[in-house]
């Protein structure tokens, strides 16, 4: 169980193709034996990401919900999070002992953020293939997320991106806030993300409670 009232809600945002759904999949598979988990995804007109998680076997289908935001996906996680809050409430009613709810935003830009009503912790995912200037551009996702994930570091030599520059810029833009460089395809850096969620979110595994 969590160390606070209700399940820990972790919001995962980032541009289209950065690796949000891949991270959701890996987190579910890595944590489901130790914690009671549910996953919620956001898409504009489909439930593609939720269906992917079901096909991948991330969790059982009843623990995965897809929210069709219709229109701007940013609004559904910030200004009017009612659909996502309702999805969280439904999961809590089905699974009263939930420890963790992972909430993936629709593909968004650097200005998108999660409402504090919806997410207790926020993780923002960018990827190297978009260029090494991304961390320096700032925006709430870069500067204010609880954890910044710089994914697809294996592509750096192929796209002419400097990981050193991204490291320097991320430190400059984020100050004391942590970031991690990853290659989620090979699960490189995943352990650091897991450790961050457990420590920052105050999670206590089922094994520890037994």
From Swiss-Prot:
Recorded superkingdom: Bacteria
Subcellular location: Cytoplasm
CDD domains: UreG
Keyword field contains Secreted: no
Keywords: Chaperone, Cytoplasm, GTP-binding, Nickel insertion, Nucleotide-binding
Gene Ontology biological process terms in this record: urea catabolic process
One Pfam family linked to the record: cobW
Record carries keyword Magnesium: no
A single GO molecular function term of this UniProt record: GTPase activity
Residues where GTP binds: 14-21
Entry GO terms, CC: cytoplasm
PANTHER family: UREASE ACCESSORY PROTEIN G
Function, as annotated: Facilitates the functional incorporation of the urease nickel metallocenter. This process requires GTP hydrolysis, probably effectuated by UreG.
Oligomer and partners: Homodimer. UreD, UreF and UreG form a complex that acts as a GTP-hydrolysis-dependent molecular chaperone, activating the urease apoprotein by helping to assemble the nickel containing metallocenter of UreC. The UreE protein probably delivers the nickel.
Family stated for the protein in its record: Belongs to the SIMIBI class G3E GTPase family. UreG subfamily.
Annotated protein name in UniProt: Urease accessory protein UreG
Gene designation: ureG
């Amino acid at each position: 169980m969590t160390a606070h009232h209700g399940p820990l809600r972790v919001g995962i945002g980032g541009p289209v193709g950065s690796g949000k759904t891949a991270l959701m999949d890996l987190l579910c598979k890595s944590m489901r034996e130790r914690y009671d988990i549910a996953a919620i995804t956001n898409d504009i007109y489909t439930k593609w990401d939720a269906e992917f998680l079901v096909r991948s076997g991330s969790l059982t289908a009843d623990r995965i919900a897809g929210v069709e935001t219709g229109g701007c996906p940013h609004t559904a996680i910030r200004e009017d999070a009612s659909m996502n809050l309702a999805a969280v409430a439904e999961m809590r009613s089905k699974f009263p002992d939930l420890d963790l709810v992972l909430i993936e935003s629709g593909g968004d830009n650097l200005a998108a953020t999660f409402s504090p009503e919806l997410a207790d912790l926020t993780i923002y995912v960018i990827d190297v293939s978009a260029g090494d200037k991304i961390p320096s551009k700032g925006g709430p996702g870069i500067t204010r997320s609880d954890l910044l994930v710089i994914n697809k570091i294996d592509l750096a030599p192929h796209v002419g991106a400097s990981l050193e520059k991204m490291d320097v810029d991320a430190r400059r833009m984020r100050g004391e806030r942590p970031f991690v460089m990853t290659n989620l395809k090979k699960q490189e850096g995943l352990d650091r993300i897991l450790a961050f969620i457990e420590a920052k979110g105050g999670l206590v595994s089922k094994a520890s409670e037994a």
